[in-house]
Regions:
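Eukaryotic charged/polar low-complexity linker/IDR segments
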Residues: 421-422, 436
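A cross-family structural signal marking well-folded subdomains
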Residues: 51, 426-429
Length: 493
């Protein structure tokens, strides 16, 4: 970089990095923390199709509004449409799902309003339930895969194989016109009665007209909600993601906390946040273009501040000096150990799930599962034949059927297989892994990653597998250099 004498060398480097595979990996880690991406959702199953879908969106540089819209309107089975994983993440908690959606994409912290009027923000419990009613036409079809497996079990296939086969076909997002939201039994306000049906209503912000909504076609409720939320006319949607990206680069958001933008006038610089919201709309929610603008600003290029001044807002004389994230630290170590070829090594377990999706219409009702019994076994037999012909199965009969679809992430990573970018490893890693020790999010709640550091991380850096591998790399490099020097000396003689 320093050898380059071009005046635009910095801008060129920014362009190069934003287009690199490493940036795609970095953005997946960032979104993984925001969207609570995990390999396995409780009672839902493996979500590898979601990982693959999200990475493809980043690779294609899909605009943020389109990406979010697709997640909110996704339909079908998890095994064939990875985007459904976003709604399936909180399938058993629809009110929490709405709360997380509003907090993540609009910076509207409405968690309190699930139980009572928000004490500090302009959100009532009625407002929350009226907004939640737009998810009322969404249902999550699932049946415990273990029970139908027992029903279907015979000598041809094991229970474990049937569970593996059924799971990607059982989890799906559908429209249910018979569903509706009602006020809770402990609703304590005079504007509605407990158990009363909620009439859908949009809650909008200043500068955006209240939408005309009809409930005659409940099928379109979620689509209407997603259209409104991601609309360029919705300033909160633009400002929320702009605020998040600003924090990613500067270490502190224009408005903190970034999950609560209800009082924008209290931001460190309200005019800056408004401008950033306009900017991201001007680039049509292209996250690469937006990041390119931020990274090329004189403000970002200024010397980093050690700590923000106490008792007053940060005026952004430059970014804050801060520790790298766990994923950035890990990826830097992996790059040292394995070199640039690391970006050519990808893990994709989605095909192992996608191949289990039934090629026929299937409704996950217990009685209908039994009716489809022979179809299911015929499909399983086809898969078994394919597996045996390609030597994927090491066992006879049906005992080893489909086991490769889950084995990849359960097997302990060894040797070079463990030195992959964080985005290619299990999401998240186990508690004892360096990534977790260094602050990787557990993905239980959004934005849970930490850059605080601590004694455990320091010890891991000095005495753990990372230190041993780095020292081994240094030793190998020194040995190679000595051999090269000896060879050169021998040639001269």
């Amino acid at each position: 970089f320093y050898a380059n004498t071009r005046k635009d060398r910095r801008a060129r480097l920014i362009d190069e990095l934003l287009e690199s595979p490493g940036h795609e990996s970095h953005m997946f880690n960032w979104l993984g923390d925001m969207l609570r991406v995990k390999d396995d959702y409780y009672r839902i199953g493996k979500t590898y199709t979601f990982h693959t879908w999200l990475k493809s969106q980043l690779r294609e540089n899909r605009p943020w509004d389109e990406l979010v819209y697709d997640m909110l309107t996704a339909e079908g089975r998890l095994g064939e449409n990875g985007a459904t994983a976003y709604l399936l993440r909180d399938a058993s908690m629809p009110l929490d799902s709405l709360s997380n959606t509003l907090t993540t994409f609009l910076g509207a912290n409405v968690a309190c309003a699930q139980c009572h009027d928000h004490p500090f923000a302009d959100w009532t419990q009625r407002d929350f339930y009226e907004m939640a009613s737009f998810f009322g036409s969404t249902d999550f079809e699932r049946v415990d895969t273990r029970k139908p497996a027992i029903t279907l079990r015979d000598d041809r296939f094991s229970k474990a194989n049937l569970v593996t086969l059924l799971q990607p076909n059982m989890e799906r997002v559908v429209f249910d016109n018979t569903r509706s939201t009602v006020f809770p039994e402990d609703y304590a306000y005079d504007d509605a009665k407990p158990g009363e049906k909620v009439v859908p209503k949009f809650i909008t912000w200043e500068g955006m007209r209240r939408a005309n909504v009809t409930t005659k076609n409940p099928r379109h409720m979620r689509t209407l909600f997603a259209t409104w939320l991601t609309s360029p006319k919705n300033p909160r949607f633009a400002e929320a993601i702009a605020n998040r990206i600003w924090k990613k680069f500067f270490g502190i958001a224009v408005m903190e906390p970034m999950t609560n933008l209800d009082k924008l006038k209290e931001a460190t610089n309200p005019q800056l946040l408004e401008f950033l919201g306009l900017l991201i709309r001007d680039v049509d929610f292209d996250l690469r273009k937006f990041q390119r603008v931020v990274l090329n600003t004189k403000t970002y290029q200024q010397q980093a501040s050690m700590t923000p001044p106490e008792g007053e807002g940060f005026r952004f004389p430059g970014p804050l000096l801060r520790r790298m994230t766990a994923e950035q630290t890990w990826d830097s170590i992996v790059l040292l150990l394995r070199g640039p070829e690391i970006d050519r090594i990808k893990t994709d377990h989605a095909p192992n799930i996608e191949r289990l999706v039934f090629p026929f219409e299937f409704e996950n009702d217990k009685k209908k599962i039994v009716k489809d019994r022979e179809k299911i076994f015929a499909f399983a037999k086809t898969l078994l034949t394919e597996q045996q012909s390609t030597k994927d199965s090491n066992s006879e009969g049906g005992r080893g059927l489909f086991m490769s679809s889950t084995k990849g992430r359960k097997t302990k990573l060894r040797g070079e297989d463990s030195w992959l970018r964080a985005s290619e490893l299990p999401q998240p890693m186990p508690p004892t892994h360096f990534l977790q020790v260094a602050g990787q999010s557990t993905r239980a709640i959004a934005d849970d990653g930490s850059t605080e550091g601590g004694i455990t991380e320091s010890l891991a850096m000095m005495n753990g597998e990372v230190a041993k591998s780095l020292m081994s790399k240094v030793s190998d490099t020194e040995t190679t250099q000595k051999e090269t020097t000896r060879n050169k000396a021998a040639k001269k003689e």
